[in-house]
């Protein structure tokens, strides 16, 4: 069953545009932190990855909660932050956001800003990253049922 879930998640993201925010976020995490977004952050704590509930377990998990909140605000404006394309560059460790297509601006630009804040947060908290909080198949029973309000 878990294998099927992973396969379906993979297929969904594989079929998403290669310029989507999802793929750009993966690249940004790798460039800024030196870590894989999937292998280091997906399933970390109570908020990293799909969904989220309970209280963040540490500073890294709070980065994910803040990222979820940022995306939630964009959805209220009618954006689709996981799908809105954007471009970014990194010069001397500084991420600069831009848009790829006029139709995805300003949503793509705003999604990039959410992602940028998240990866900077991850970088600031690398020293306190706790491998014990990372689960490949997150069920998150320790997180409770309620979602922390933004």
Swiss-Prot record:
Its cofactor is Ca(2+). Glycans are attached at residue 92. GO terms for cellular component: extracellular region. The keyword Glycoprotein applies. Keywords: Calcium, Disulfide bond, Glycoprotein, Hydrolase, Lipid degradation, Lipid metabolism, Metal-binding, Secreted, Signal. GO terms for molecular function: calcium ion binding; phospholipase A2 activity. CDD domains: PLA2c. It is found in: Secreted. Testis specific. Ca(2+) binds at residues 47, 49, 51, 68. Its main location: secreted. This is Group IIC secretory phospholipase A2. Pfam families: Phospholip_A2_1. It is an enzyme of class 3 (hydrolase). The active site is at residues 67, 115. PA2 catalyzes the calcium-dependent hydrolysis of the 2-acyl groups in 3-sn-phosphoglycerides. Testis PA2 may be important in the production of prostaglandins, by the release of arachidonic acid, which in turn are necessary for the contractions of the seminiferous tubules and the testicular capsule; they also seem to decrease sperm transit time through the male reproductive tract. Gene3D superfamilies: Phospholipase A2 domain (1.20.90.10). The keyword GTP-binding does not apply.
């Amino acid at each position: 069953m878990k294998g099927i879930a992973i396969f379906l998640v993979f297929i969904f993201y594989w079929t998403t545009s290669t310029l989507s925010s999802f793929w750009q976020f993966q690249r940004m995490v790798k460039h800024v932190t030196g870590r894989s977004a999937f292998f280091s952050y997906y399933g970390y704590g109570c908020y990293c990855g799909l969904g989220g509930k309970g209280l963040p377990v540490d500073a890294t998990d709070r980065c994910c909660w803040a990222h979820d909140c940022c995306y939630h605000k964009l959805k209220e404006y009618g954006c689709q932050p996981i799908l809105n394309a954007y471009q970014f560059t990194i010069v001397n460790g500084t991420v600069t956001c831009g848009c790829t297509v006029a139709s995805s601006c300003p949503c793509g630009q705003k999604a990039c800003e959410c992602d940028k804040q998240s990866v900077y947060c991850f970088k600031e908290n690398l020293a306190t990253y706790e491998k014990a909080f990372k689960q490949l198949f997150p069920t998150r029973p320790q997180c409770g049922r309620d979602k922390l309000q933004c």
